[in-house]
């Protein structure tokens, strides 16, 4: 593929934008090479500035659950724009959004809109500390909750991709207030709570890890956290920025039947526009200013254009059997990829929850961060580029989940699998040639 225009833009971008991108994973540092620059998107496709089309399984990192540029969302945005871009004052759409979230996710008795997932998690942690009078928070290896200082402690996603345990600029004193546990380890959680449960303000967790690829909870694990938190007066925060309205209409908490005290949202609730939210029990949310003393504010929070896009999206995903079709499409993709890898003699495991999935180049099921990092990342990188050359775009990191949309029809899935069969066989052939070249010559 000729990517001359993308290359020129990337060179230019690096003179004005750190690393040439506005979020690290976009730079392709993990997989090698240079990123392509997008000109437009429609349905299941991205189109780059060099005229290439890609079947997209990144979906803007999750929010495009009905496909790119859906006419229902686009028209809602056009109507909202005709009435103004930002008010700095309350509008009816933000009330409707709060009511909609509360109806679909009953644990959210009250909701506060913000501008990003990071802003939502930072606000939820401040609320938890203020409401409990405690300072310690607990997170899990491989979980990513945005770029807030309290979370950049053995973080996943971009941090994992860059291979850094933390970030310069995060005070050591603050890091000491974040305790990191192994996800899916029952005994580790129990031991920590027995030792210092009464000092912990909150446990924050991705109920399905999507930032160390796609790792679901072991049976009963989320309920175990719920039980411990209740016993010790600790707030349980589900970070559903990724899983919210993605794995089920009511999010992961509905799928697994576990009720958190607070929930953070992003991505899908903005319909592709910048947005975030956090919500939870009424008695907790009443601590937020101006109802209470815990401060949080935002000039663009509840932006009318973002609210219009999000409400249109939330309306579309309530269609009958929407999630059944979404899950079936993801299952067909994962089953087909698994079969294609197996036929080529390549060890790969797929894991899928609803409309999100993960590809692990290993022959084992992956339940922990350590297992995810032990997978064959070099082989993933080869697969990524082989698929990209064939017009299929997966996340440019072995540690990011993939996403499917309602626009990914059976024909799109089959086109993906056809490309994958060729890609896997090419990788297998390359490995065989390399193996032969490395075989020592026997001297007689």
Swiss-Prot record:
Q: Which reaction does it catalyse?
A: (S)-4-amino-5-oxopentanoate = 5-aminolevulinate
Provide the protein's localization: Cytoplasm
The family database entries (PROSITE patterns) matched by this protein are listed as: AA_TRANSFER_CLASS_3
**Annotated Gene Ontology MF terms?**
glutamate-1-semialdehyde 2,1-aminomutase activity; pyridoxal phosphate binding; transaminase activity
The EC number on file is 5.4.3.8
For the modification N6-(pyridoxal phosphate)lysine, the affected residues are: 267
Q: Which SUPFAM superfamilies match?
A: PLP-dependent transferases
Kindly report the protein's main subcellular placement as a broad class: cytoplasm
For biological process, the GO terms are: protoporphyrinogen IX biosynthetic process
Q: Does the keyword Manganese apply?
A: no
Alphabetized, the UniProt keywords read: Cytoplasm, Isomerase, Porphyrin biosynthesis, Pyridoxal phosphate
Q: What are the required cofactors?
A: pyridoxal 5'-phosphate
**Pathway noted in the entry:** Porphyrin-containing compound metabolism; protoporphyrin-IX biosynthesis; 5-aminolevulinate from L-glutamyl-tRNA(Glu): step 2/2
Give the family, as the similarity comment puts it: Belongs to the class-III pyridoxal-phosphate-dependent aminotransferase family. HemL subfamily.
According to the record's subunit comment, the protein's assembly and interactions are: Homodimer.
| Protein name per UniProt | Glutamate-1-semialdehyde 2,1-aminomutase
Gene responsible for this protein: hemL
């Amino acid at each position: 593929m000729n990517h001359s225009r993308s290359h020129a833009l990337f060179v230019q971008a690096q003179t004005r934008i750190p690393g040439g991108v506005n979020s690290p994973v976009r730079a392709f540092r993990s997989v090698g090479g240079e990123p392509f620059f997008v000109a437009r998107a429609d349905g299941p496709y991205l189109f780059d500035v060099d005229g290439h089309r890609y079947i997209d399984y990144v979906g803007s990192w999750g929010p495009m659950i009905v496909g790119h540029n859906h006419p229902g969302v686009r028209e809602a945005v056009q109507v909202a724009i005709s009435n103004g871009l930002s008010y700095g004052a309350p509008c009816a759409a933000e009330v409707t959004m709060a009511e909609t979230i509360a109806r679909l996710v009953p644990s959210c008795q009250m909701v506060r809109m913000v501008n990003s997932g990071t802003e939502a998690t930072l606000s939820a942690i401040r609320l938890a500390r203020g409401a409990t009078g405690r300072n310690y928070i607990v997170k899990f290896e491989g979980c990513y909750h945005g770029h807030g200082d309290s979370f950049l402690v053995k973080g996943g996603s971009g941090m994992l991709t860059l291979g850094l345990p933390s970030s310069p600029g995060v005070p050591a004193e603050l890091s000491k207030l974040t305790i990191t546990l192994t996800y899916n380890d029952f005994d580790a959680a129990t031991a920590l709570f027995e030792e210092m449960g009464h000092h912990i303000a909150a446990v924050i967790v991705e109920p399905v890890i999507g930032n160390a690829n796609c790792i679901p909870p072991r049976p009963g694990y989320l309920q175990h956290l719920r039980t411990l938190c209740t016993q010790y007066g600790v707030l349980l925060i589900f970070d559903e920025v990724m899983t919210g309205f993605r794995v089920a209409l009511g999010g992961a908490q509905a799928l697994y039947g576990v009720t958190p005290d607070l929930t953070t949202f992003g991505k899908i609730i903005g319909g592709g526009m910048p947005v975030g939210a956090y919500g939870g029990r009424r008695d907790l949310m009443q601590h937020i200013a101006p109802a209470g003393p815990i401060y949080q504010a935002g000039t663009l929070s509840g932006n009318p254009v973002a609210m219009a896009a999000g409400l249109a999206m939330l309306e579309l995903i309530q269609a009958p059997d929407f999630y059944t079709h979404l899950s079936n499409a993801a299952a067909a993709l994962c089953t087909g990829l698994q079969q294609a890898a197996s036929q080529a003699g390549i060890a790969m495991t797929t894991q899928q929850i609803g409309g999100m999935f993960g590809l692990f180049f290993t022959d084992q099921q992956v339940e922990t961060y350590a297992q995810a990092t032990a997978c064959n990342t070099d082989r993933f990188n080869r697969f990524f580029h082989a698929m990209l050359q064939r017009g299929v775009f997966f996340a440019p990191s072995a540690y990011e989940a993939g996403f499917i949309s309602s626009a990914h029809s059976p024909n799109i899935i089959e086109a993906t699998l056809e490309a994958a069969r060729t890609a896997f066989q090419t990788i297998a052939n390359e490995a065989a040639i390399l193996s032969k070249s490395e075989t020592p010559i026997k001297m007689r």
